[in-house]
UniProtKB/Swiss-Prot annotation:
Cellular-component GO terms for this entry: cytosol
Native source organism of the sequence: Burkholderia multivorans (strain ATCC 17616 / 249)
Localization per record: Cytoplasm
Protein name: Putative pre-16S rRNA nuclease
Cytoplasm found in the keyword field: yes
Top-level taxon in the UniProt lineage: Bacteria
Molecular function in Gene Ontology: nuclease activity
EC number(s) per entry: 3.1.-.-
GO BP term, pick one: rRNA 5'-end processing
Length: 149
């Protein structure tokens, strides 16, 4: 991972949606994640320009993409689009991509924001980034201290 120990890896996570893409950043050493930004998903050119700028700024070692699934684990309408997005990230930027089951991430994100009294426009504006944080935190929480990351 680009000269960085896997245990100290910086990760960017994405909650891919048709209209917006939530982005979070985290670190494997501290096992912490935070919501970063929401990218309007206007078109392919805009999407990858914005992602490229984030990658240049944060220099992550790997990427995590939420994989939408129905509650019973079957593929969702957005499953294939999220997979394609992750594959495009890998192809364009050459970074490893891990997919994480994102069932209930938006529900958990909204509940967490409500708990912190984030209201109105602020909650709407950051919900997708908070969902990306939840996805990344799930990934970080499942990392074993004994396996390479």
């Amino acid at each position: 991972m680009s000269g960085t120990s896997a245990r100290d890896a910086t990760l960017l996570a994405f909650d891919y949606g048709e209209k917006r893409i939530g982005v979070a950043i985290g670190n494997a050493l501290t096992r912490s994640a935070r919501a970063l930004v929401v990218i309007p998903n206007l078109n392919r050119e805009h999407r990858f320009k914005a992602v490229g700028e984030l990658l240049a700024e944060w220099r992550p070692d790997a990427l995590v993409v939420g994989l939408p699934m129905h509650p019973d684990g079957t593929p969702h309408d957005m499953t294939q689009q999220a997979k394609r997005f992750g594959n495009q990230l890998n192809g364009r930027f050459g970074l490893p991509v891990t997919w994480v089951d994102e069932r209930y991430s938006s529900v958990e994100a909204e509940a967490g924001m409500r708990e912190r009294n984030v209201r109105g426009r602020a909650r709407t504006d950051m919900l997708d980034a908070e969902a990306a944080r939840v996805i990344l935190q799930q990934y970080l929480d499942q990392l074993s201290d004994h396996e390479p990351h």
